[in-house]
Amino acid sequence: ANIRLLSKNYIEMGIAQADLINDAYNGTGIFVSTQCSGYKAIAALYPEACQIVVHNDSGINSIDDLLGKKVSIGESDSGTEQTANLILQLNGLSDKLVDTLNYDYTTAAGKLQSGEIDAFFCTAGLRTTIIEELAQQCPIKFLSISDSCSKKLESAYDTYVDYTIPANTYTGQTEEIKTVAVQAVLLASNELSDIVVESLTEFLFEHSADLQYSVPVNLQLDETSAVKGISIPFHPGAVKYYKKHNIKVKSE
């Protein structure tokens, strides 16, 4: 949604998933007929981990076990939906083999708890509030992504990286979870001036500790990591900031 709003100049800044940004900017994937431009990158803020949640008593222990199950893959045209579809396809599970449904995270968590669905995908920063709230109400577990699947995903999309959800991130989760992650990227409209964006970029890094208190995810803000996993050009204002710190980024 943020990408479309930016491209139509309804908003001046927004956060979106790196792989979705790449497709929107280049007119590929779900944006093949609706290319969205008019924005550029400022910085990657934090990794969004792909979390596949099932009930602890479900008997589902791997992605292969989702065969024939009801699975929420996130809202339509969302980054979560794109990631979920890719992972299911790479595991040989097409739409015909899995009953995929499009629910937001809150709805999906409720339906998993009531037994109306068997699993749901959630691509978000840790610790995801809705998952922690669910974990406190009923026993859940997470499905790991195999090394072969993650390697295939990373070779197809350079925006994905291996990621480990540490043990005890959530209530009752005593083992680490192997998965993949994609960066949540801060974007700026092309209409924002270079001076404004350069100042915003500087503020972002100089006050990262203060900003951490205002968000529920673990911000990972340093200039070096903030430019990784982004395939679209950076805003000229951000480019100027990074140049001052001897960091080369993609520009037009």
Where are the predicted features?
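Short, glycine-/small- and polar/acidic-enriched structural segments
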Residues: 1-67, 72-75
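Short, flexible segments with low predicted structural confidence
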Residues: 23-24, 82-84, 106, 171-172, ...
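Sec/Tat-exported extracytoplasmic proteins
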Residues: 10, 15, 22-28, 56, ...
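Bilobed "Venus flytrap"/periplasmic-binding protein-like clamshell domains
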Residues: 47-114, 228, 232-237
